[in-house]
Regions:
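Glycine-rich, low-complexity intrinsically disordered segments
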Residues: 1-174
Length: 174
């Protein structure tokens, strides 16, 4: 039987039920090399590199789920004015699974709506949650195009791809 999963991000509530594919991103560790007269010797580095989290989802007929991601990207990039980023930042009470806040004395700009946390839940053959991959501080980096085709003979549902960057993820056995 195919492995089932759920993708949950409170900043994207309408994407969860339409999610078609998701990946557990790869991770790599940099390394340092010390040259010796006989052989170069590798040593573990101190920086982890995470690949992007990619998901694909069916787009609803009103484009609501596509617009959620689109508006998040617009807010991050602020292509028309700086108020777009301020508005996004001020909507930052939507963290999942836990809310992260800055302390009032750290003199930094609160991250607000810039980031969200997300969870990819892996289900067993009986649809019981077995593993959670918890992504911390995700934000979208790309949203795929939508292609309309009036000549298609079958019912083709619109599907879009989105890539996220994030700080790190953890794998939790349930």
């Amino acid at each position: 039987s195919p492995v089932q999963f759920r993708f949950k991000c409170s900043k994207l509530p309408t994407v969860e039920f339409f999610c078609q594919t998701a990946n557990i991103p790869g991770i790599s560790l940099g390394q340092a090399t010390i040259d010796t007269p006989l052989k170069s010797i590798p040593f573990p580095g101190d920086e982890l590199n995470y690949q992007d989290l990619g998901i694909s989802f069916l787009v609803d007929e009103n484009l609501n789920n596509y617009k959620e991601i689109h508006d998040w990207l617009i807010g991050l990039g602020a292509p028309q004015n700086h108020n777009q980023f301020s508005t996004l930042r001020d909507t930052g009470t939507d963290r999942f699974p836990g809310q992260t806040t800055n302390s009032p004395n750290n003199n930094t700009v609160p991250d607000g709506g810039t980031y969200s946390d997300a969870t990819l839940t892996i289900l067993n053959s009986k649809n019981i949650a077995k593993v959670e991959i918890r992504f911390h501080n995700i934000f979208p980096t790309s949203l795929g195009a939508l292609s309309y085709d009036v000549q298609a003979s079958d019912v083709n549902y619109l599907q879009a791809n989105v890539d996220f960057s994030y700080m790190y993820y953890e794998i939790v056995q349930l």
